[in-house]
A protein has these predicted regions:
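Extracytoplasmic thiol/disulfide redox context detector
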Residues: 2-5, 14-98, 161-177, 181, ...
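C-terminal cap of thioredoxin/glutaredoxin-like
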Residues: 2-4, 28, 140-211
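Short coil/turn linker and secondary-structure boundary residues
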Residues: 33-36, 116, 133, 147, ...
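Short clusters of hydrophobic/aromatic residues that line enzyme substrate/ligand-binding pockets
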Residues: 50-51, 132, 192
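Structural alpha/beta surface segment adjacent to cysteine/selenocysteine redox centers
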Residues: 61-67, 72-143, 206-211
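Generic signature of intrinsically disordered, low-complexity segments enriched in small/polar residues
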Residues: 19, 41, 67-69, 113, ...
């Protein structure tokens, strides 16, 4: 027999669980953006190459920060997807919400891209076990990955105006798209909200192909 005194507590517990489930379901949504906005995102100048297929049937645009824990957690899932699905294109756009050091890290990858080593720089920074709190931390990671930081920094000094404009444009896109924080993910013109694990990422790509 159920103790009547425990009923209110159980009702409250059930209500809380239902509310939590509703919030989770609502959070895991996709929202289409205007076609012109999506085309502008795809056409905007970049300092780094696309990843995966050059012209895939599904394009994922990720706005990220090298110091963002959730971005670091998402990166291996994206890599796994690219390994299993050769028809996906990934465009990475820097959104250094964690500050100047994150922006410097982005600039380092732009300079590395000119050497044909963007993937090496990106992988080293996004998977770094040490915090990137100072420029010296970024330099240490880059040096360990085989980069000559005098050359990298010279390139950044020479092209800082160009690199800054690219980051500013990417940040403006996040406002236009209504992104709330890193990582910001857009798949074939739909803004993805909520946690993205590997299973959901695969599902989102499959859904994009249907539409």
């Amino acid at each position: 027999m159920t103790n009547s005194s425990s009923l209110p507590r159980r009702i409250l517990t059930c209500a809380f669980l239902l509310l939590a489930a509703g919030i989770t379901a609502q959070a895991q949504t996709t929202k289409p953006v205007a076609p012109a906005t999506w085309q502008a995102v795809l056409a905007s100048p970049r300092a780094t190459p696309v990843v995966g297929a050059a012209k895939g049937d599904v394009t994922i645009v990720e706005y990220f920060d090298y110091n963002c824990p959730d971005c670091r957690a998402l990166d291996p899932k994206v890599r796994q997807l690219l390994t299993s699905d050769p028809h996906v294109t990934v465009i990475r756009k820097d959104w250094p919400v964690f500050g100047d050091v994150s922006e410097y890290a982005a600039y380092c990858t732009y300079a590395a891209a000119k050497e044909g080593k963007y993937a090496t720089a990106h992988d080293a920074l996004i998977s770094s076990k040490q915090d990137l709190d100072k420029k010296e931390d970024v330099q240490s990671v880059m040096q360990a990955a085989g980069f000559d930081m005098k050359k990298i920094d010279a390139d950044i000094t020479q092209h800082q105006k160009q690199y800054s404009a690219i980051v500013a444009a990417d940040e403006h896109e996040t406002d236009v798209l209504g992104l709330k924080g890193t990582p910001g993910v857009v798949i074939n013109g739909k803004v993805v909200s909520g946690k993205i694990d590997y299973a959901r990422l695969v599902s989102l790509v499959a859904d994009a192909r249907k539409h």
